[in-house]
From Swiss-Prot:
Keywords: Arsenical resistance, Cytoplasm, Disulfide bond, Oxidoreductase, Redox-active center
GO cellular component, one term: cytoplasm
Gene of this entry: arsC
InterPro entries for this protein: Arsenate_reductase_ArsC, Ptyr_pPase, Ptyr_pPase_sf
SMART domains: LMWPc
Name of the protein in question: Arsenate reductase
Role, per record: Catalyzes the reduction of arsenate [As(V)] to arsenite [As(III)].
Residue positions of the active site: C11 (nucleophile), C83 (nucleophile), C90 (nucleophile)
Top EC category: oxidoreductase
PANTHER family noted in UniProt: ARSENATE REDUCTASE
Primary subcellular site in the record, as a coarse category: cytoplasm
Annotated disulfide bonds: C11-C83, C83-C90
Catalytic activity line of the entry: arsenate + [thioredoxin]-dithiol + H(+) = arsenite + [thioredoxin]-disulfide + H2O
Length: 140
């Protein structure tokens, strides 16, 4: 079995964006990468994130909301921050760990009816999915 590279998705609360990213990455990168996600804090898995990912056939309901694990952070090959807060507050990583920032809106901040909120979750879900698919195809 070949050694997989480690990708670590970070956002503020590990409830929406990084959870969706973990789900997409397991689909697109699972053969070559070990996929993890975490937050500066752990806010619990957002039920709307679970719902909209299920719509595209990806079950994230068993993923857990975790705070950043220094051990994973320090041995990751790639750390991806998904919000400005995580980019600003992410612990220092060793020089061998590549860090990139892919910014996405926070769907948990969406206002309006339940349907309007879900529309924002779907948009962010699709944006994250497209970004990870591009990374899977191009390596960047």
């Amino acid at each position: 079995m070949k050694n997989k590279k480690i990708i670590y998705f970070l956002c503020t609360g590990n409830s929406c964006r990084s959870q969706m990213a973990e789900g997409w990455a397991k689909k697109y990168l699972g053969d070559d990468w070990e996929v993890y996600s975490a937050g500066i804090e752990a806010h619990g898995l957002n039920p709307n994130a679970v719902k909209v990912m299920k719509e595209v056939g990806i079950d994230i309901s068993n993923q857990t909301s975790d705070v950043i694990d220094p051990e994973i952070l320090n041995k990751a090959d790639l750390v991806v921050t998904l919000c400005g807060h995580a980019a600003d507050h992410c612990p220092v990583t060793p020089p061998n760990v590549k860090r990139v920032h892919w910014g996405f809106d926070d769907p948990a901040k969406a206002e309006g009816t339940e349907e309007e909120k879900l529309a924002v979750f779907r948009r962010v879900r699709d944006e994250i999915g497209a970004r990870i698919k591009k990374f899977a195809e191009t390596g960047e």
